[in-house]
């Protein structure tokens, strides 16, 4: 994981509002513009395919964290989905 990717990942637990997610999405967009080669899924098609796959298997992500999958989506969960879609294969 690159240093920039680690910075993005570190922001996720503090995302508790729509405004926080807006800021995070802006940071993801900027990261794509400046670090495109670090993205496994730089095209919209690849990004959405990875998003679909990650959402389908995100139970393992939460199990690895020792947490249940939230019953209702949260701003933080949406940020996890977006961030994972950047790199999920």
Specify the residue positions occupied by each region the protein language model found.
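N-terminal accessory alpha/beta regions
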Residues: 50, 54-60, 64-67, 72
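Amphipathic alpha-helical binding modules
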Residues: 64-89
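Intrinsically disordered, low-complexity regions enriched in small/polar residues
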Residues: 26, 49, 63-64, 80
């Amino acid at each position: 994981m690159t240093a920039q990717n680690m910075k993005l990942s570190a922001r996720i637990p503090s995302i508790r509002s729509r405004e926080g997610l807006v800021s995070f999405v802006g940071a993801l967009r900027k990261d794509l513009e400046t670090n495109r080669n670090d993205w496994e899924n730089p095209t919209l098609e690849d990004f959405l395919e990875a998003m679909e796959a990650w959402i389908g298997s995100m139970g393992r992500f939460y199990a690895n964290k020792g947490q249940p999958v939230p019953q209702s989506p949260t701003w933080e969960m949406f940020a996890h989905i977006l961030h994972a879609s950047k790199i999920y294969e």
